[in-house]
């Protein structure tokens, strides 16, 4: 049985855009570069040829990777699922660090979509695991490498 990878609608759209670009722009450009490099003669010492072949290998590998992810993904539209006012996959959560009054806003996404610098956290991260299923005004304790941290849930958005 295949384990489906949870992915937001935005995450799937981003992968589809990348796949389209790789297939319609990058792949033809690389093929043209290989053909041009072949015209220069001896392929053994042709750096342009080897560089283009390496780029082709990377491009084709990424195409296969994206196609596999999309075929094994469960695309979840957070706006269309019941949440009962609780934190769920795909929701955007504003939390307050009770100790230092620092506020954070995170969106809970799939592993491949996560980007901490953009406040996109993986469903499998300690913060997300601690928040899932909780409601506004709940206090959660998140185990971090620096010790346990208490957060209060201020706001939950489903966008």
Curated annotation (Swiss-Prot):
The keyword Nuclease does not apply. Pfam families: GreA_GreB (PF01272), GreA_GreB_N (PF03449). GO terms for molecular function: DNA binding; RNA polymerase binding. Gene3D superfamilies: Transcription elongation factor, GreA/GreB, C-terminal domain, Transcription elongation factor, GreA/GreB, N-terminal domain. Keywords: DNA-binding, Transcription, Transcription regulation. It comes from the Bacteria. GO terms for biological process: DNA-templated transcription elongation; regulation of DNA-templated transcription elongation. NCBIfam families: greA, PRK00226.1-2, PRK00226.1-4, PRK00226.1-5. Belongs to the GreA/GreB family. PANTHER family: TRANSCRIPTION ELONGATION FACTOR GREA. Necessary for efficient RNA polymerase transcription elongation past template-encoded arresting sites. The arresting sites in DNA have the property of trapping a certain fraction of elongating RNA polymerases that pass through, resulting in locked ternary complexes. Cleavage of the nascent transcript by cleavage factors such as GreA or GreB allows the resumption of elongation from the new 3'terminus. GreA releases sequences of 2 to 3 nucleotides. This is Transcription elongation factor GreA. The lineage of its organism: Bacteria, Pseudomonadati, Pseudomonadota, Gammaproteobacteria, Enterobacterales. The gene is greA.
